[in-house]
């Protein structure tokens, strides 16, 4: 399943190290947010969260 397959509204807090905005997710993959940051259409495979958000390198 595409990790970005979720509504782009509301917050997404995946544990203590992964926080995304503009999405509506409740779970998080080990190496990547289960949702995309605003303006990101698709997460790159194998991307990792940097700090408290998914870095732009996560997007493709």
Curated annotation (Swiss-Prot):
A divalent metal cation 5 binds at residues 33, 35-36, 49. It comes from the Eukaryota. A divalent metal cation 7 binds at residues 49, 54, 58-59. A divalent metal cation 2 binds at residues 6, 12, 14, 25. Keywords: Metal-binding, Metal-thiolate cluster. A divalent metal cation 4 binds at residues 32-33, 43, 47. Residues 29-60 are annotated as: Alpha. Residues 1-28 are annotated as: Beta. The keyword Flavoprotein does not apply. One of its GO terms (molecular function) is metal ion binding. Belongs to the metallothionein superfamily. Type 1 family. Class I metallothioneins contain 2 metal-binding domains: four divalent ions are chelated within cluster A of the alpha domain and are coordinated via cysteinyl thiolate bridges to 11 cysteine ligands. Cluster B, the corresponding region within the beta domain, can ligate three divalent ions to 9 cysteines. Metallothioneins have a high content of cysteine residues that bind various heavy metals. This is Metallothionein A. It comes from Carassius cuvieri (Japanese white crucian carp).
């Amino acid at each position: 399943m595409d990790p970005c397959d979720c509504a782009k509204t509301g917050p997404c807090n995946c544990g203590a190290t992964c926080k995304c905005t503009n999405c509506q997710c409740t779970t998080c993959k080990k190496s990547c947010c289960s949702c995309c940051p605003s303006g990101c259409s698709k997460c790159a495979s194998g991307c990792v969260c940097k700090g408290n958000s998914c870095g732009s390198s996560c997007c493709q």
